[in-house]
Every structure is written in structure tokens, then in C-alpha cells.
Curated annotation (Swiss-Prot):
GO terms for molecular function: ATP binding; pantetheine-phosphate adenylyltransferase activity. The record marks H17 as: Transition state stabilizer. Pathway: Cofactor biosynthesis; coenzyme A biosynthesis; CoA from (R)-pantothenate: step 4/5. GO terms for cellular component: cytoplasm. Homohexamer. Reversibly transfers an adenylyl group from ATP to 4'-phosphopantetheine, yielding dephospho-CoA (dPCoA) and pyrophosphate. Its cofactor is Mg(2+). Its EC number is 2.7.7.3. Keywords: ATP-binding, Coenzyme A biosynthesis, Cytoplasm, Magnesium, Nucleotide-binding, Nucleotidyltransferase, Transferase. Belongs to the bacterial CoaD family. It comes from the Bacteria. This is Phosphopantetheine adenylyltransferase. ATP binds at S9, F10, H17, G88, L89, R90, E98, Y123, S124, Y125, L126, S127, S128, S129.
Amino acid sequence: MKIGVYPGSFDPVTNGHLDIIERASKIFDKLIVAVLVNPNKTPVFDIDERVELLKETTEHLPNVEVKAFKGLLIDFMKQENAKVIVKGLRAVSDFEYEFQMALLNKKLEPSIETIFMMTNSKYSYLSSSMVKEVARFGGCIEDLVPEKIAKKVMKKLNKKYAEMEENK
């Protein structure tokens, strides 16, 4: 069985993420969307919320599983018996970072491969950070995140930013 892992923080999941997930799910027998706990980031959505949003978003894809993980991706890959990391690229700047990570992962575990998938051009500008920025200033995010979860995402972001304003 060919198992791929698409890791990320997904805070929140965007239409760009979903595009990569849908396309990668056609390549692998099983695709695991691995939601990482990143100690270098302070997420708006906690790990359970991100996992749940991704499960809702991908429920139409029978070979996709969503799991949270901490620690090294390589250790998670071994635990899941996966051999391929899937990374989405929007721009050259993404490639530079992801290329370094791919080389590091290869150094840590030579049997692991990384494949890069170019984002659909209509999502090349899109990031979770941009979704949060648009929401923060009252913009519409419905075309930026999967329709199925747009209202939940907006509600959470509105609540978060209202709390931030109160604490100023």
C-alpha cells in the first residue's frame, strides 16, 4: 500500500490545502493529513479544532485520514509506515524552505521521499495567514476556505479577534 503524508499546521485549512489533498489522494492508496503541533507558532485553532475542520473538509475522500502529531515528521512517518511526504508549493520562496526540509528529512531517514506539488494557480496567493488577516479586518473568507467550514472558521476568527481587542 502506498501511503503519503501531507503535513502542515492548517490554521485554518484553506482551499489551497484542499486542492493539494484532493490531488494527492489520487496518487496514494492512503493519504494521511498530518496536523502538527508546532512549538514555533501560536495557532488560532487548537489541535483538536484543526483536526476536526480537516475531517469535515475531507470526508468526501475515503482514502484520506487526518491525524495530529508532535515531534519529528520522520518519526510520525515511521509510525504510520509511510514513505512519501507531500508538500504543496505556491512560489519559489516556498521551494527554498521545503527543499531544505526535504534534504534534512532525507538525512534523518534515507528511505523517505518528498514530492512537491504545485498549487493550482488560482490559489497561488493563498495562505492560512492571509485568511486570518482578511477575517481580522472583516473581509469575506468564503472563497478562501472550504465552503463546508467557512462559517465555523469565520465565527472562531471573529471571536479570537474580539478577545484580542478587549485585551488591548
